[in-house]
């Protein structure tokens, strides 16, 4: 159970990081 929760937290963290990086690149392209 703990490993599953840790895996889910890591997945959400990776998804958030990817989304933030994508938005950052879009802002750089717009500028």
UniProtKB/Swiss-Prot annotation:
GO CC terms: chloroplast thylakoid membrane; cytochrome b6f complex
Bilayer disposition of the protein: Single-pass membrane protein
GO MF terms, alphabetically ordered: electron transporter, transferring electrons within cytochrome b6/f complex of photosystem II activity
GO BP: photosynthesis
Transmembrane domains' residue ranges: 4-24
Protein location: Plastid, Chloroplast thylakoid membrane
Principal location: plastid
UniProt cross-references to Pfam families, sorted A to Z: PetL
Alphabetically ordered keywords of this record: Chloroplast, Electron transport, Membrane, Photosynthesis, Plastid, Thylakoid, Transmembrane, Transmembrane helix, Transport
Family: Belongs to the PetL family.
Quaternary structure and interacting proteins, as annotated: The 4 large subunits of the cytochrome b6-f complex are cytochrome b6, subunit IV (17 kDa polypeptide, PetD), cytochrome f and the Rieske protein, while the 4 small subunits are PetG, PetL, PetM and PetN. The complex functions as a dimer.
Reported function: Component of the cytochrome b6-f complex, which mediates electron transfer between photosystem II (PSII) and photosystem I (PSI), cyclic electron flow around PSI, and state transitions. PetL is important for photoautotrophic growth as well as for electron transfer efficiency and stability of the cytochrome b6-f complex.
HAMAP family per record: Cytb6_f_PetL
Protein name: Cytochrome b6-f complex subunit 6
């Amino acid at each position: 159970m703990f490993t599953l929760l840790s895996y889910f937290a890591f997945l959400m963290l990776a998804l958030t990081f990817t989304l933030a990086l994508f938005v950052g690149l879009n802002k750089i392209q717009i500028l």
